[in-house]
A protein has these predicted regions:
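A broadly tuned preference for mixed-charge, low-complexity surface segments
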Residues: 4, 49-62, 138-150
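Conserved catalytic core of nucleotide-sugar-dependent glycosyltransferases
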Residues: 8-105
């Protein structure tokens, strides 16, 4: 696990990830989390997501109720891997600090990541490595198909809660229930 120092994950998050990994493994997708903050009124906001239409996002439908969809932005300030994924990460260019930039090794160039800073690249991990056809990244989140709501068990907390109150940033401005209700 890689985790930025101001992120909180729960036991429920770990249980979700473990179960979802089994479901998603055959598709080469990785269960992901959504970084959230609470505002002064205790409403939950997605830190780095925009409003989307669920039917425009790449997704895998698991049953009549749940799908796993690519979030607009896979940044989650962490990654959580089992042994197999960690081995893949450590034995690939995704663990190289130059990954994405390509300045020292052109084989590590990734246009999606070229402008990421070192901390952002560290959390990306395998998101952009061996992406299944039709997807934007390997990271997917569980969404209730009927309600178009992100499932609570994949929400992780950004402890400072600094973005929802900051009027000078676009981070933390979309209510969690509105992410797929555009």
């Amino acid at each position: 696990m890689y985790l930025e120092d101001d992120i909180s994950i729960s036991r429920e998050n770990i249980i979700y990830w473990t179960k979802a990994r089994i479901l998603l493994k055959e598709f080469n997708l990785i269960p992901s989390f959504i970084l959230t903050e609470k505002n002064i009124n205790e409403k939950i906001y997605a830190v780095n997501q925009k409003k989307n239409k669920l039917n425009t996002r790449p997704r895998i439908i698991i049953n009549n109720d749940i799908c796993f969809a690519n979030p607009e932005n896979p940044y989650q300030a962490m990654y959580f891997y089992d042994r197999e994924l960690m081995e893949e990460h450590l034995n690939s260019s995704s663990s190289n600090p130059d990954y994405g930039h390509g300045a020292y090794n052109i084989s590590t160039l990734n246009q999606t990541m070229i402008n990421f800073d070192l901390v952002a690249k560290a959390n990306v991990g395998l998101a952009y490595k061996s992406i299944p056809e039709g997807f934007f990244s390997r990271y997917v989140i569980p969404v209730n198909l009927k309600k178009k709501l992100i499932q609570d068990y994949c929400l992780i907390k950004h402890l400072p809660n600094k973005y929802t109150a900051d009027k000078n940033t676009y981070f933390g401005k979309v209510k969690i229930e509105d992410v797929f209700n555009k």
